[in-house]
Amino acid sequence: MTNAPGAGGPTALSAGSAASAEPWRAPVAAGALEAVVELPGSKSLSARALLLAALADAPTTLTGLLRSRDTELMLAALSVLGARFEDLGGSGTHLRVTPAPLPLHVQTGPDGLGRIDVGLAGTVMRFVPALAALADTPVVFDGDEAARRRPMAPLLDALAALGADVTHLGEPGFLPFRVGPGDGALLRAEGTRVAVDGSASSQFVSALLLLGALLPGGLELTPTGPVPSLTHVGMTVATLRERGIAVDEPALRAGDGERTWRVHPGRPRGGEVAIEPDLSNAGPFLAAALVAGGRVSVPHW
């Protein structure tokens, strides 16, 4: 039986098609390698470094920043909240960050509101709304069409429980929405506890941990369900500690609903920060040295 063209059966490959193309030839090292390879910074670490620098107690110089759409969206969002950024090298990977004052002073439009486009950047859509609870003016958040399908309810519910003013501007629990400071009680609280359903994203937990350091009495945070990607929560805790913020972590064997993080109050420390490259980008270059011999160095890692 012969299949007609377009009927889903096999068709003959024409000359010059993939079947007859020359195979790609991998490069071969002429000898042992000796190289220094500058790689872009980790996307996750770049987002956290920018946010903590924007909230620090003094200016911060960032080296090795990843330049991507997510980074550009984070820079724009933090600028709306009052932080300032100066490109020191012309490439956008070396920045001086002047932190925003508290309460965060929102750069508003003609309607008197701040507006932040989160695009499709998870760290912008989850981390930055938590900061808007400490702003002096409400901020409207929206993003790409696909972003409007990503869940936000656990974070928004937690912020409302902390006293923030949360207004849904579309389907409840999704973008777009508005977050404001409410009556400002968060900046007066001497001790704050909150629970969050972290089962949809560990970013909800990280967002509240980052917020907690700015509260006068810190924050005690208990996720109510299983938290995926606990390694990313660990990354958030590590970056907070590197900037001088004390964080108490739950016991290793604590079960779901029993894990509690305690963030002690304080503004992150400014200064010089080098952002570690992403391991997935570094891997091929390091493997090349193992195969060919010699040495390949990756700075800041």
Located regions from the model:
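Structural preference for solvent-exposed beta-strand-turn elements
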Residues: 1-301
